[in-house]
């Protein structure tokens, strides 16, 4: 999976948990919470959806890695690729 595909996965999850948010102008380098009306429960929903939909575990200590789309892609792309290699 590429980093761009990984960013799209995160955006798809956000679109599902916060359907009223306009995701068309999200800047990948800026913290998601600074751009969108996401609270801590929404953030936990993102983590839970990554686990439910994609079997990606994000330990609490790594939550800050999901702050922006860029940092999410950096963190999640190797995890997605490791899962793909196992299948």
Question: Model-flagged regions — what are they?
Answer:
Residues 2-38, 46-48, 52-53, 57-87:
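Phosphopantetheine-dependent thiolation modules in NRPS/PKS and related acyl-activating systems
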Residues 42:
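Two-component histidine kinase catalytic core, primarily the HATPase_c
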């Amino acid at each position: 999976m590429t980093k761009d595909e990984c960013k799209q996965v995160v955006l798809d999850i956000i679109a599902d948990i916060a359907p009223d948010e306009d995701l068309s102008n999200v800047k990948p380098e800026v913290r998601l919470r600074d751009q969108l009306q996401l609270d801590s429960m929404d953030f936990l929903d993102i983590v839970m959806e990554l686990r439910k939909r994609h079997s990606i575990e994000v330990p609490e200590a790594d939550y800050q890695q999901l702050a922006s789309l860029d940092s999410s892609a950096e963190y999640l792309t190797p995890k997605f690729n490791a899962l793909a290699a196992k299948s």
